[in-house]
From Swiss-Prot:
A Pfam family matched in the record: PrmA
UniProt enzyme class: transferase
Family: Belongs to the class I-like SAM-binding methyltransferase superfamily. Protein arginine N-methyltransferase family. PRMT7 subfamily.
Official protein name in the record: Protein arginine N-methyltransferase 7
Quaternary organization: Present in large multiprotein complexes.
Cytoplasm recorded as keyword: yes
PANTHER family hit by this protein: PROTEIN ARGININE N-METHYLTRANSFERASE (PTHR11006), PROTEIN ARGININE N-METHYLTRANSFERASE 7 (PTHR11006:SF4)
Organism: Trypanosoma brucei brucei (strain 927/4 GUTat10.1)
Chief localization: cytoplasm
Protein purpose: Arginine methyltransferase that specifically catalyzes the formation of omega-N monomethylarginine (MMA). Has activity toward multiple substrates in vitro. Able to mediate the arginine methylation of histones and myelin basic protein (MBP) in vitro; the relevance of such results is however unclear in vivo.
Domain of life where this protein originates: Eukaryota
Lineage: Eukaryota, Discoba, Euglenozoa, Kinetoplastea, Metakinetoplastina
SUPFAM superfamilies reported in the protein's UniProt record: S-adenosyl-L-methionine-dependent methyltransferases
Annotated localization: Cytoplasm
Length: 390
């Protein structure tokens, strides 16, 4: 039977409390009653009045247009991503299966579930514009009898909006950093309120990795020492060794530049979306890293792998060589490294076989993290980091 129809009803104040605990709000989402929320600016207001803007774009939130053109098209054309979801869904969807998707976007994954014969599919999307387009896509595929789109945040979703508790919870709300779009928090919220113990969560597992790398190409665009006989090193005072930057924002694909991994991958955390919670990831963790090669660790490279059954979806540069869309939607992330907290950054130099202690600090919502090399003691042993942490 098709899902019950509901108008977009007045928000419960408890919805606000739920949403305010989650760090990421998707582009174009409508959250007028959430604390600190500002209505999205219309695209036409960002364009010089002498430049013509098509009517289809004029009043659309600028953040949504930027997001769709920045990564949504690439995401929908990532064949390996699409096949990952289709193959996992194929193992779990039957004519008796009810499917709930959160962060539905274009509705593609919900359409997959319907195509595979799900009894009903409810697609939840926080952006009014995307929800409308998802409905159009569903109508274009003659699946409106199976798939219903609800314009609301998943934190606003109630059991009354669903025909029954879903058999499958489906989502693809990962960022360049695996939890960069608060994927765990959104899944946990729905899991705690709306799922039954037997609900299959797709995908189920995910692991965030980091690895120190030597990369001359990155070094040349993120630092300076001088030109000919001119000393310019004081410009390094402003080098950002705190922020995590997406590789594509540097204008590079990591698999198209030469770099060396100076250690084995560091498993920062592992998540089981069917049981893990935010607090399962400590706010601070230490990692002993053994150098497998000597060299200068210019940066920490971040990537993730999501798995379900035998299927894997990965942003490791080795796994995206032939997947340009994957690198344009997610790619990898980088954090430049500093061996000290001095007036100028100090290179992190690795010696093969030597042990290095790194500290990883997470933001309260676990969306943001930072890697820091702990200094050596006088006897050559690594010590606890002394940088500012909370």
């Amino acid at each position: 039977m098709p899902p019950k129809q509901h108008r977009h009803q007045k928000k419960d104040k408890n919805d606000n409390a739920l949403q305010n605990t989650i760090g990421f709000v998707p582009p174009g989402a409508t959250l007028a009653s959430v604390s600190g929320y500002r209505p999205p600016d219309a695209f036409v207001n960002r364009i010089d009045r002498n430049i013509p803007v098509p009517a289809r774009l004029r009043h659309t939130p600028v953040s949504l247009i930027e997001a769709v053109n920045d990564f949504h098209y690439a995401m929908m054309n990532d064949e390996e991503r699409n096949n990952f979801y289709y193959e996992v869904l194929k193992k779990h969807v039957t004519p008796e299966t009810g499917v709930l998707e959160i962060g539905a976007g274009s509705g593609l994954l919900s359409l997959m579930a319907a195509k595979l014969g799900a009894k009903w599919v409810v697609a939840v999307e926080g952006s009014e514009e995307l929800a409308k387009l998802a409905r159009e896509n569903i109508r274009a595929n003659n699946m409106e009898h199976q798939v219903k789109v609800l314009h609301m945040m998943s934190t606003e979703l109630k059991s009354k909006h669903l025909p029954e508790p879903p058999d499958v919870l489906l989502s693809e709300i990962f960022g360049t950093m695996m939890l960069g779009e608060s994927a765990l928090d959104y899944v946990v919220d729905v899991r705690n309120r709306l799922l039954k113990p037997t609900t299959k969560i797709i995908p189920q597992f995910g692991t965030q990795y980091a690895v120190p790398i030597e990369c001359d190409a990155l070094h040349r665009i993120s630092s300076v020492s001088g030109w000919r006989d001119l000393d310019l090193k004081h410009m390094m005072t402003l080098q950002d060794t705190v922020s995590i930057v997406f590789a594509k924002h540097y204008g590079i694909r990591m698999n198209s530049v030469n770099f060396r991994r100076l250690s084995d991958p560091i498993e920062l955390f592992r998540v089981d979306f069917s049981s893990s919670n935010r607090n399962d990831i400590p706010r601070r963790k230490h990692f002993d890293v053994v150098a497998k090669e000597s060299g200068t660790a210019h940066a920490m490279l971040f990537y993730w792998k999501v798995t379900d059954d035998e299927f894997v979806m990965s942003t490791d540069p080795e796994d995206t060589v032939n997947n340009f869309p994957r690198d344009m939607q997610w790619g990898q992330a980088l954090q430049l490294l500093d061996a000290s907290n001095g007036p100028l950054p100090t290179p992190v130099v690795f010696t093969e076989g030597k042990n290095y202690n790194f500290e990883c600090n997470f933001s309260g919502d676990r969306v943001i993290l930072h890697m820091q090399l702990c200094p050596e003691s006088g006897n050559g042993e690594m010590t606890e980091c002394e940088g500012k942490t909370t």
